[in-house]
Amino acid sequence: MRDMLGLMKQAQAMQEKIQQMQAEIERLEVEGQSGGGMVRVTLSAKGQLRNLAIDDQLIKADEKQILEDLIITAHEDARKKAERLMEEKMQGVTAGLALPPGMKLPF
């Protein structure tokens, strides 16, 4: 019975930490870039596009396809950074828990 109570307290404390972490994650941003910084995207840690910056040199009609490819690459770069950032932040919250390998918490 004592073990069950301790487990419930641990679960409640973890839930509070997760809620705090979610609030912090909402405020975090990452930047991805491509083309040597000519295209930059800023994403929230959850992957929402917050800003797109394109160097003036790229805005030419005959380079439309290049620009589109660079935007996609910059977005993917930022998305990967956001994913790594969330994983790093959650490691502190889930430290000490016996989670199965590869298990991701729902955010």
UniProtKB/Swiss-Prot annotation:
Asked whether the UniProt record includes rRNA-binding among its keywords, one would answer no
Entry's localization field:
Cytoplasm, Nucleoid
> Quick one: where is this thing mainly located?
cytoplasm
By its UniProt entry, which Gene3D superfamilies does this protein fall under? Nucleoid-associated protein YbaB-like domain (3.30.1310.10)
Q: Which SUPFAM superfamilies does this entry report, sorted A to Z? A: YbaB-like (SSF82607)
Report if keyword Cell division is assigned.
no
Q: Which GO terms describe its cellular component?
A: bacterial nucleoid; cytosol
GO molecular function terms attached to this record:
DNA binding
Top-rank taxon of the source lineage equals Bacteria
The UniProt entry, under InterPro entries, shows: YbaB-like_sf, YbaB/EbfC
Which key words tag this protein in UniProt?
A: Cytoplasm, DNA-binding
Q: What does this protein do?
A: Binds to DNA and alters its conformation. May be involved in regulation of gene expression, nucleoid organization and DNA protection.
Q: Which family does it belong to?
A: Belongs to the YbaB/EbfC family.
What subunit structure does UniProt give?
Homodimer.
The record's section on PANTHER family has: NUCLEOID-ASSOCIATED PROTEIN YBAB
In Swiss-Prot or TrEMBL terms, this protein is called Nucleoid-associated protein Msil_0275
Q: Which organism is it from?
A: Methylocella silvestris (strain DSM 15510 / CIP 108128 / LMG 27833 / NCIMB 13906 / BL2)
